[in-house]
Amino acid sequence: MIINKKYILFILLLLFITSCTIVFSQQQQQQTEQSEQTEQAINNDVNNSINDIFENDSSKQLRQPQQQHTIVDDGNNNNNNNNNNNNNNNNNNNNNNNNNNNNNNNNNNNPIDNKDILGLKKLALLKQFEEQKSKSENDINNDIVILNLENDNPNQIIETTTTTLNNSNDNKNNIIDDNQDEKLNENIKEDKNEIKNEIKNENQEKDKGIIDVEKDENQPNIEEKGKEKQNLLEKGIENENQNENQIQIEKEKEIEIEIEKEKEKENKELIEESKTEKDNQQKENKENTNEINVTVVEEPEQPQPQQQNQQEQQEQQQQEHKEEQQQQEQQQQEQQTQQEQQTHQQQQEHQETQKNSSEETKTQSPIQVNTTDVNNEIELKNEGDNNSQLNDSSIPITSPLTNDNDTLKTTKEDSNNNNKNEVINNQTPLIDEKNHQHNYEGNNRNGDDVSIISNIPKTNKAPETQQQQQQQQQQQQQQQQQQQQQQQQQQQQQQQQQQQQQQQQQQHVVLTPNDLPDKFNYASSECGANVLQTNKEAWEVSSILASSRDRYLLNECNKSQWFVVELCEEIGVQIIELANFEFFSSMFKDFIVLGSNRYPAQSWHYLGQFTAENSRKQQYFVLKEKAWYKYLKVKILSHYGDQLYCPISSFKVYGSTMVDDLKNQVDINISELEKFQRDLSSIPYPMEIGSDTSYSTTTSTTSSSSTSSSYPSSKTKSSNSEYPSWERIQSFSEKLRKNVEQQLIQPPSVLNTNDNNNNNNNNNNNNNNNNNNNNNNNNNEEQFIYYETNGNGGPPSTSTSTSSSSSQNHQARTPQSVFKTLADKIKAIEFNQSIGNKFMEKLERYYSEEIKNLKFDVSEFLNDIIKLGNSLDEKLKDHRKYDDNKFKETSKEIKILKEKIEKLEEQKSADRNFYLVVTLVSLLIGLLLKPLFTSSSSSSNKSYPNSMPNSPTYLNSGSNNYNNNGIINSSGGSGGGGGNLQNSSFIGINGQLNFSDDNISAFLNSSCSNFGLNNNNNNNNGINNNNNNSNSNSNNNSINNGSININSNNSLQQRIHHNKYIHQRRNSSPLVGVQLESFFSPNAIPPTIPIVPQDDNNINYNYNNNNNTNNINNNYNYNNNNNNNNNNNNNNNNNNNNNSDNYNNNNNSNNNVNSPSSPTPSSIILSPKFITSIPKNINYYNNGGSGSHLKNRFSRQASESVLSQNHYQINHQNHSLNGVTTNINNNNSNSNGNSNGNSNNMTNGLPPVSMPSSSSHDNLLLHRGNNQSKKYKRRSHL
């Protein structure tokens, strides 16, 4: 029976599906059982892990402060508490919402699969984190305390909540105990660290994949909440940092303010010094105008840059103009007040004179003046001015001829000395009528009274008041003019002094080393100076420091020249000496000098640029300022001349050390002291007028009654003694008053200014105190007065010039001036000491504050270290617990993974068994169904598929020879067993191909079943034998464009249609109608072998309808390992006139060729197996003539050995069969095919060809038309 393939495939699919369903159901049952077991184990593990986590996290929860601290301000407290309560309520609501969300999430969760084992742990962790988070938010909102500790006030802290973080700066005055502060700091730091660690751990777990549960829509966003916590903490930390930064900034600002204040003070002091210097200069100018020569030794000013000097000069000028304007205004006001006072005094005097006009003095006594008492009174006044103790106090000043009751009071003004002059000038003498004595009263510290005793006779004439007033007015005008002139002179002198100072700065006094006190060369090699570095081209570097002139430093002028010298020690450089004594060399011209105190120096200080002369001698270059350096660098910039070399013979440096400067200052002070002592020894004592000498004067009669006056001494009196008149007394009193004004009253102002100068200079330069004091001593010493009498013994004459009085004044010295100078010195020292004490107090305060700050910082640092040491143990414990918990968790996870692995292995083994069973079942089914596909039926009406009737391997056989080892071709002609039998089989060649009936039957079904061939002799494999039509069948081939009609006597006609394997012929001729099918039958070709490609090159088998001869030569060469014989089977086909094919079988067989055991069929069609087993080259030829020749050549070489000469093979490469076919005619035409004729005779002398060894490639050449061919390659894989 015929079984359809579709049904078989359908049955196989059903079987496979049923087996799969059975196995799948079994696996599900196993998984459900395992899941029930694992759920219990997992629940237990999760519960244990959750308990462990809660235990660990309980220690890490936020620690609440022990006490709730209060704030001082009640209003702020209430607000903060309300805010905290509101925050708590909000947090509770949030917690409730979170719990609801968690419940919803738990309800919405899908059932847990066996593979999502860690999902349970995730859910547990989420629950735990949410609960912990809700607690932590409440704790944070209520109990987080952020401390803002300032360096100045460490006990001040700020307590704020999350709602009042922005108000942290407002509550700086809240105070909490130190212990509580420490506890709170520790708790806050620990809480911050714990929250950060938790967030880090969560992020790490997310990165590792421990928590992989998908977030639902209702699930709380944990990451955002964690970020909120971080933000809160960061805000607190930022506020702390900001407060600390603010504190530091405030401190820095305070320090800067203090520095600025100090700078301002220094500037003020400098300005005051400049003012005082100006005042001194002005007063000196006044003294010069008054012919009182005062020598002032100015201090050496420190060198300053020109710009600063110019600015200071401008400022000074501006200030001077302002001061002058102020002084003028003050003078005008004073003049007005003085005029009013004068008018008032004149009225009083006029009244008194009218009363006393009746009384006149007749007798006059000599006036005795105690200069010592006057000096005492003046010194008292000066002391009062210097000490400035009597502010707004009245000082009684009386003239030598004043009454006790008539005193004038004037206010104290130290800055304006002209007021005193004007007040004294405005005073008029008043006469005591009773006693005829003029008393001069003054207030002393000792309470001594200074009296001027006078014996004046009364006169009847009274002075004219109008004349006096006019004279006074004229005097005042003269004084004003003098003052104006003095001011102009002062301004001119100031300008001159400024110009002189500028010139002194530009012009240096020091020109050579001889001008220096120390002429030592500090750049000599003898004291240890060295040349440290020079330019590379320099030769004999150390020669410039030597003393000999024959040695020199040599350089080329074109190269850059420079050298660095280390001096013996650090000095104040003043003079530099350079010299070049070599002739026929260029001279250095311009050079620069640089200095530094370190070597190698990062930067050099510019000292100056100098130009030398073109002379062979020593040249000195003086620095503008004295600079203190140890290392000097000299760079030569240019030179004189065009010579090749520029030598330098010597280099010397002159200056002074600090010790030398101090010694010089000490020496100067000592010399000044010696001078002072000499001056003291040469001071004469003052003499009283009229004590030792007597003098007489002649009176100048101004009126009708004139008298003579005499000033008798204590010893002798002149006989011609006459009393002076009133006018003479008045003139004498005026002269005395002028002398007092010029010589005694003005110098104290100078003293004051000098004292102030000393004090200010001592603030700036303490080293120059001695110089200043000594200079002031000289100034003070020259201010004392000595009165000498004329040769006549009388008072000084009025005709004496100011120059003579000034010269006399310089010769006088008083013993009290020495004590005054000493007192001034002591005051200056005390003042300096007080300033030094204040400075030291400031330094002590500054350093004490710094030490306190350092102590505070150190204590904080130590406290931090202690806290860290205490917290390290706790952290170690926490880390150990954390590590233990992690170890436990990992061990549990490892166990779970092991269980998973075991389960997977079990599943794998089950799957293996399943697939083995399936494969075995499929094999069994295939074996069972194989016979259905391979078995053939014996019915004659069996339908066969399309065959290849015109295949080149299709050969006709006419005889039944069972012993033919080659290809047996027979036709119905000769032979008793003549019948047209067409059978196909495989011939076993050397045991490589097996002969089987199945192959034969399959091949017959595929190729040879449609021709109605009958064989009347043999029945082979179900072939019907018909004896009726033997030797009487004639084959007529009619070709009709793609169809083959086979006519036989049995009137068997069959139409063969082309199938899908037939090549479509395109270029067909009218003679050719048969199209070539594929070389292989569809049933004979395995599915792995590719089919010949569809191509246009179709082979035309041309058969002549006129019964032309078809010469088919089948040459088969079988080469065996034994090279002794050659087996050639030549089949020569001759077409007779009777349309019969004569096949001569010449078979030369030897021992190597074994006949098959089964009967050999009469025709052979080569199968694919045969083709693949034998490497082959198949050539199809079509010459396009009336007759075509088809030749198949198969060659096989069994071994790689060289063929012997007896082996003949036919070359099949591109040969045409026209005239090449070898026709071997045998006389014997037996059906057995055994003949011993000329079987090995070949025509055309074809040479033997050696074929290559067996390979897997076969070449297919298709020739068509006029030598057109195409080559196809096909690789066989069988």
Swiss-Prot record:
Residues 58-115, 198-227, 261-430, 436-455, 691-725, 747-815, 935-957, 1020-1046, 1100-1162, 1217-1278 are annotated as: Disordered. Keywords: Coiled coil, Glycoprotein, Membrane, Nucleus, Signal, Transmembrane, Transmembrane helix. Residues 501-658 form the SUN domain. Residues 1-25 form the signal peptide. Pfam families: Sad1_UNC. Residues 177-349, 464-509, 883-914 form a coiled coil. Its main location: nucleus. GO terms for biological process: culmination involved in sorocarp development; mitotic cytokinesis. Residues 59-70, 363-375, 385-405 have a biased composition (Polar residues). It is found in: Nucleus membrane. Glycans are attached at residues 47, 56, 166, 293, 356, 370, 386, 391, 405, 558, 669, 832, 941, 969, 983, 994, 999, 1005, 1028, 1036, 1041, 1049, 1107, 1138, 1147, 1214, 1227, 1241, 1267. SUPFAM superfamilies: Galactose-binding domain-like (SSF49785). InterPro entries: Galactose-bd-like_sf, Suco/Slp1-like, SUN_dom. PROSITE patterns: SUN. Residues 261-289, 347-362, 406-415 have a biased composition (Basic and acidic residues). The chain crosses the membrane at residues 914-934. Residues 76-110, 304-317, 327-346, 416-426, 691-721, 752-780, 797-807, 1218-1245 have a biased composition (Low complexity). It is a single-pass membrane protein. GO terms for cellular component: cytoplasm; membrane; nuclear membrane; nucleus; vacuole. The SUN domain may play a role in nuclear anchoring. This is SUN domain-containing protein 2. It comes from Dictyostelium discoideum (Social amoeba). The gene is sun2.
